[in-house]
């Protein structure tokens, strides 16, 4: 029987330099949709939990007076701080190295707490209860943001081949084994769902849902796709050890065979937003 998976600090080790280039962005219109749904006017405070390199926090920063991003990975926070400086947001952003389960004292009260594809990595009941205590009692919002899992994203009609996802996944398995890797452990059953039940038990009585539509055509280079693979927890660079160079060479050969021009087409995923109010 496989031991239960436990978080460790290597989960995203080495992925930060690849993250921004490799991950597809959230759907255009997400900040505007969130602002309209929650009445955001630039005066509140945002807590982004599991912020990574600021992928979500920085595009939302103009909606708040202050943004606090929390992440346990120092590489992610360094990327976030660098990008915030480039956007002229240093004075409005703060980056805190901590696990969500160990949020430090003194963070203050927040209007909104966001979790962008991060909540499933956490002790969700503990984090939900802690974050509820940090949110405004009169309508503070716990916001879960992720790519919409339903709906086809065919590249049909676009100018370049689709990314050969199944072949890439097979290559990762050849190097790392058949069971999904996650830090130093294995994750055979994937990450958990059921956020509604978790948040209800934590005392969030109201839920809203909105979908920000995607579907826009995207052009991706071989370098973009390689970065995407190396940004994932299950194919993080450190997992390959001394074979990282060989894996990347095989991956590039696979991609150039699929598209000799070195270009791929994808469609922007839609973004699902679920909101629980205090």
Where would I find each of the regions flagged by the language model?
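A short, conserved alpha-helix within the catalytic core of class I
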Residues: 122-131
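Conserved catalytic/acceptor-binding region of the Class I
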Residues: 132, 136-216
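Conserved Class I S-adenosyl-L-methionine
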Residues: 190-278
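Conserved beta-strand/loop positions that form the S-adenosyl-L-methionine
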Residues: 49
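Short catalytic micro-motifs in class I SAM-dependent methyltransferases
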Residues: 117
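A short acidic, Gly/Pro-enriched loop at the edge of an enzyme's catalytic core
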Residues: 104-112
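Conserved class I S-adenosyl-L-methionine
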Residues: 1-41
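Class I SAM-dependent methyltransferase SAM/SAH-binding core
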Residues: 45, 53-102
């Amino acid at each position: 029987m496989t031991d239960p998976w436990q978080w460790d600090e290597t989960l995203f080790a080495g992925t930060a330099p690849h993250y921004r280039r490799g991950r597809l962005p959230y759907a255009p219109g997400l900040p505007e949709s969130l602002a309209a749904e929650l009445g955001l006017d630039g005066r509140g405070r945002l807590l982004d939990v599991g912020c990574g390199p600021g992928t979500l926090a920085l595009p939302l920063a103009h909606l708040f007076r202050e943004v606090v991003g929390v992440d346990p990975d120092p590489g992610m926070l360094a990327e976030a701080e660098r990008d915030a400086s480039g956007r002229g947001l240093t004075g409005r952003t703060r980056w805190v190295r901590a696990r969500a389960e160990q949020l430090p004292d003194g963070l203050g009260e927040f209007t909104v707490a966001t979790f962008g594809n991060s909540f499933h990595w956490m002790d969700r009941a503990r984090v939900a209860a802690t974050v509820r205590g940090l949110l405004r009692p009169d309508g503070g919002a716990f916001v879960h943001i992720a790519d919409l899992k339903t709906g086809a994203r065919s590249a049909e009609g676009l100018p370049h081949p689709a990314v050969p996802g199944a072949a890439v996944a097979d290559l990762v398995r050849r190097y790392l084994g058949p069971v999904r890797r996650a830090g130093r452990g294995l994750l055979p059953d994937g990450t958990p769902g059921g956020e509604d039940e978790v948040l209800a038990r934590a005392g969030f009585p109201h839920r809203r849902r909105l979908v920000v539509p995607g579907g826009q055509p995207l052009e991706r280079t071989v370098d973009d796709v390689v970065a995407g693979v190396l940004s994932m927890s299950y194919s993080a660079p450190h997992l390959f050890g001394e074979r990282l160079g060989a894996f990347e060479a095989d991956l590039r050969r696979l991609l150039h065979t699929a598209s000799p021009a070195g270009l791929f087409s994808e469609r922007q995923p839609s973004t699902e937003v679920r909101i629980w109010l205090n």
